[in-house]
Amino acid sequence: MSKIVSRTVSSIAAALPLALALIGSSASAQTLTPQPRTLGIYAGINAGVGVYEWDCGTSCGRTAFSGKLFGGKRLTPGLAAEVNYMFFGRVDNANEPGLAATTNIAAEERKASAITLGINWEVELLHDVTNHLRIGVARVKREQDIARPSGAVESVSSYRTAPHVGAGLSLQVVRDLRINTNFDYIVDGENSLYLFSVGGSMEF
């Protein structure tokens, strides 16, 4: 009996290193197996404050609730082609009689929207914290409701093309979810637009 037990123990002892090696090899293979790749497509929504660069009269507003929808396709791990749709809330202006007579504008309301196309360059600053730099071109639509001193009211729509630049930070909350803060600037002289916003994005 003792010989049988001894042989059994010896067999187990001989097989144990091989079993441990196989287990270790399996665990190593699982560790080295890459995570399933995403499609490299992301989309998000932000809300915040929009600012109009507006040489307006004696009583005017330049800020309004605004926001943007955005999405992109990664070209490399740190570079993506991106499109944004930005909407800027309505602001208004009222001129004093003297200025109204000079400009032929008694009061005015305006709002704007823009579609931008450009690139999003990402640089990881810290673990899960990424810096975003954006550059592109914007197609801007402006809508104005103008009240003339005579009492007439007219609506005017116009389109302009202008450069778009932006910067921001994002924090990766989970693997495919980020929260972000962004600054966007549509560079168009006295018609420039600014957007300060926060929001989130998902990657697919």
Language model feature labels by segment:
Residues 55-61, 125-127, 159, 186-195:
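Solvent-exposed loop/turn segments connecting transmembrane beta-strands
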Residues 71-72, 120-122, 168-170, 184, ...:
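Transmembrane beta-barrel domains of outer membrane proteins
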Residues 1-39:
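Cleavable N-terminal export/targeting peptides
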Residues 51-57, 89-95, 139-147, 187-191:
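Gram-negative outer-membrane beta-barrel proteins
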Residues 42, 171, 192-204:
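Outer-membrane beta-barrel "beta-signal"
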Residues 25-81, 85-87, 115, 121-124, ...:
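Short glycine/proline- and aromatic-enriched beta-strand/turn motifs that initiate or cap beta-hairpins
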Residues 55-58, 101-108, 149-156, 183-186:
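Extracellular loop and loop/strand-boundary signature of outer-membrane beta-barrel proteins
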Residues 39, 61-67, 111-115, 159-165, ...:
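Residues that define the transmembrane beta-barrel architecture of outer-membrane proteins
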